[in-house]
C-alpha cells in the first residue's frame, strides 16, 4: 500500500490540486508527490517510511539542517510562554538588531510573515517614497504572488508553463516593465524612456526561481548606477539568497548597497517569518511614521522569531559558511564529473549553500537560456535520483540547497548515486 498515493488522492478531494503550493504537485516531472512525515539533519522520511537525502531544504530555510536540536529547544521554550500576542516583544527587537549588524544596508527593518508580503510592501513603499508608479522586474525572477509582480515570473509559473497568472487585471500590471536578466542595453533603454516614472527596480541578485542564474558584475553595477542617477529605489529580493549564499547575502558578494532588501526563509529557521528593510528615510515612510500602510496580525510571531534568532546565532559561528560552500562545491563538481564521464550534456553551478543543475552545455544567463535547456533530461535525472533515495526540487526551474548537516561523506554518497543515474540515462 503506497501511502503517498492514498494521501494524494485524499488531498485532491479537499485541496485544489492536492497541494498548498503548486510546485509540490510534481506537475512538471510527473508522478506522485512524497508526503513528508518527519525530517532530521540532512534527511526527510515520507509516509511510506522511505528515507531521502534532502536537497530541497524546505526550499532554502533549512540551512542548519532539519530539526536542529538548538532550534527545536528555542522554539519549545518560546511556545511555553505563549504562541502569539498581537503586541510588541523583545525578541522582534533582537532579531532586527542582529539582521542590521549583518547587513549594513538595513538601517530600519519591519517583520512580516511571508516573502510575498515583504516584496509586495517593498514595492508599495518604493512607490510611496518616490511618488512614481512604474516598476522594473526581470523575466524569470519570482517575487511572490502579489498581483503587480506576477508578470513573466519564475518559480511555479515557469514550472507550469504560465508566463503570468490569470486573475490579474491588466491595470495592475500596466506599470510593470519586464526586462531580460543580465541585459544592460534593455535596462538603459528603459531608464532613457521612462526614468522619471520608475519607482524601483526589483531583482533576485542570484536568481533561484529559474534554477540558479548569476548576474554579471557589469549588470549589478549598471543597476546601482542607473537607479541612483534617476532617483529610483533599488530592491534586492534576498528572500532566497539572504544568509544562504553568504552571511551578508548576495549584496555582500556584489559589493552593492541596495536601498531596500527583502528577506525570509533562513531568518525564520523553518518558521513563517520574513522582513523588508533598508534606508532610514525610505523605511520611515511606512505606517505609523508615514503614509504607506502595512500591517499583520502574526507579524513578528514570537515562536518564529525564536527559531530565527537561534538560526542566526548558529550560522554566525566560525567556519559555518566556509564549510557550507565547500560541501556545495563538492556536490556540483562531483555531478559535473559524473555527467561528463557518461557523455551527458550537463553543467552545474553554486554559490554558498545554493546550487543549480542544468542539462545544457553552459550555465544560463537569463530565462531564454534556461528555457532552451533539456527539461526532459532533468525529469529523468530527478526520478532516477528520487528512486534511489535522493530528493531534489520537482522542477528544472528550481535551485537546490545544501545544509550544514550534509557531511562530506554524505555528499560522496549522493555523487555515487548520480554516477549510476547518469550511466542509466546514457544507456
From Swiss-Prot:
Residue numbers of N6-(pyridoxal phosphate)lysine PTMs: 265
GO cellular component, one term: cytoplasm
Domain of life, per lineage: Bacteria
Localization: Cytoplasm
InterPro entries: 4pyrrol_synth_GluAld_NH2Trfase (IPR004639), Aminotrans_3 (IPR005814), Aminotrans_3_PPA_site (IPR049704), PyrdxlP-dep_Trfase (IPR015424), PyrdxlP-dep_Trfase_major (IPR015421), PyrdxlP-dep_Trfase_small (IPR015422)
Pathway in which the depicted protein is active: Porphyrin-containing compound metabolism; protoporphyrin-IX biosynthesis; 5-aminolevulinate from L-glutamyl-tRNA(Glu): step 2/2
Enzyme class, UniProt record, top EC level: isomerase
Cofactor(s) needed for function: pyridoxal 5'-phosphate
GO biological process: protoporphyrinogen IX biosynthetic process
SUPFAM superfamilies named among the record's database cross-references: PLP-dependent transferases (SSF53383)
Catalytic reaction annotation: (S)-4-amino-5-oxopentanoate = 5-aminolevulinate
Transport found in the keyword field: no
Listed Pfam families: Aminotran_3
Predominant location category: cytoplasm
Keywords annotated in UniProt: Cytoplasm, Isomerase, Porphyrin biosynthesis, Pyridoxal phosphate
A molecular function (GO) term: pyridoxal phosphate binding
Entry's EC annotation: 5.4.3.8
Sequence similarity: Belongs to the class-III pyridoxal-phosphate-dependent aminotransferase family. HemL subfamily.
Complex and partners: Homodimer.
Protein name: Glutamate-1-semialdehyde 2,1-aminomutase
Amino acid at each position: 500500500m503506497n501511502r503517498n498515493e492514498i494521501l494524494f488522492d485524499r488531498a485532491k478531494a479537499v485541496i485544489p490540486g492536492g497541494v498548498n503550493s503548486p510546485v509540490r504537485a510534481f506537475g512538471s516531472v510527473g508522478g506522485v508527490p512524497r508526503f513528508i512525515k518527519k525530517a532530521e539533519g540532512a534527511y526527510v522520511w515520507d509516509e511510506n517510511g522511505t528515507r531521502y537525502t534532502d536537497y530541497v531544504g524546505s526550499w532554502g530555510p533549512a540551512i542548519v539542517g532539519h530539526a536542529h536540536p538548538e532550534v527545536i529547544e528555542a522554539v519549545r521554550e518560546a511556545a511555553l510562554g505563549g504562541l502569539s500576542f498581537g503586541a510588541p516583544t523583545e525578541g522582534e527587537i533582537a532579531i532586527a538588531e542582529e539582521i542590521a549588524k549583518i547587513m549594513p544596508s538595513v538601517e530600519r527593518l519591519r517583520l512580516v510573515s511571508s516573502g510575498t508580503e515583504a516584496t509586495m510592501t517593498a514595492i508599495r513603499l518604493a512607490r510611496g517614497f518616490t511618488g512614481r508608479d512604474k516598476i522594473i522586474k526581470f523575466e524569470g525572477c519570482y517575487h511572490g504572488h502579489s498581483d503587480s509582480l506576477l508578470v513573466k515570473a519564475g518559480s511555479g509559473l515557469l514550472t507550469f508553463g504560465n508566463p503570468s497568472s490569470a486573475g490579474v487585471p491588466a491595470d495592475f500590471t500596466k506599470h510593470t516593465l519586464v526586462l531580460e536578466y543580465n541585459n544592460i542595453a534593455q535596462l538603459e533603454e528603459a531608464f532613457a524612456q521612462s526614468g522619471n516614472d520608475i519607482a524601483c527596480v526589483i531583482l533576485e541578485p542570484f536568481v533561484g526561481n529559474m534554477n540558479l542564474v548569476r548576474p554579471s558584475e557589469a549588470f549589478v553595477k549598471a543597476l546601482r548606477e542607473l537607479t541612483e542617477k534617476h532617483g529610483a529605489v533599488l530592491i534586492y529580493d534576498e528572500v532566497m539568497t539572504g544568509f544562504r549564499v553568504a552571511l551578508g547575502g548576495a549584496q555582500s558578494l556584489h559589493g552593492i548597497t541596495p536601498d531596500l532588501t527583502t528577506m525570509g526563509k533562513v531568518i525564520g529557521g523553518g518558521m513563517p517569518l520574513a522582513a523588508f528593510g533598508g534606508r532610514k528615510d525610505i523605511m520611515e515612510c511606512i505606517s505609523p511614521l508615514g503614509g504607506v500602510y502595512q500591517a499583520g496580525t502574526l507579524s513578528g510571531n514570537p515562536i518564529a522569531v525564536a527559531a530565527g534568532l537561534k538560526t542566526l546565532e548558529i550560522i554566525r559561528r566560525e567556519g559555518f559558511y566556509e564549510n557550507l560552500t565547500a560541501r556545495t562545491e563538492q556536490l556540483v563538481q562531483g555531478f559535473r564529473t559524473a555527467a561528463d564521464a557518461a557523455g551527458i550534456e550537463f553543467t552545474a553551478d553554486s554559490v554558498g549553500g545554493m546550487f543549480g543543475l542544468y542539462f545544457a552545455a553552459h550555465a544560463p544567463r537569463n530565462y531564454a537560456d534556461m528555457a532552451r535547456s533539456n527539461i526532459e533530461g532533468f525529469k529523468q535525472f530527478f526520478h532516477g535520483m528520487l528512486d534511489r533515495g535522493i530528493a531534489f526540487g520537482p522542477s528544472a526551474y528550481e535551485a537546490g540547497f545544501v545544509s550544514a548537516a550534509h557531511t562530506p561523506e554524505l555528499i560522496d554518497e549522493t555523487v555515487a548515486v548520480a554516477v549510476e543515474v547518469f550511466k542509466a540515462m546514457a544507456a
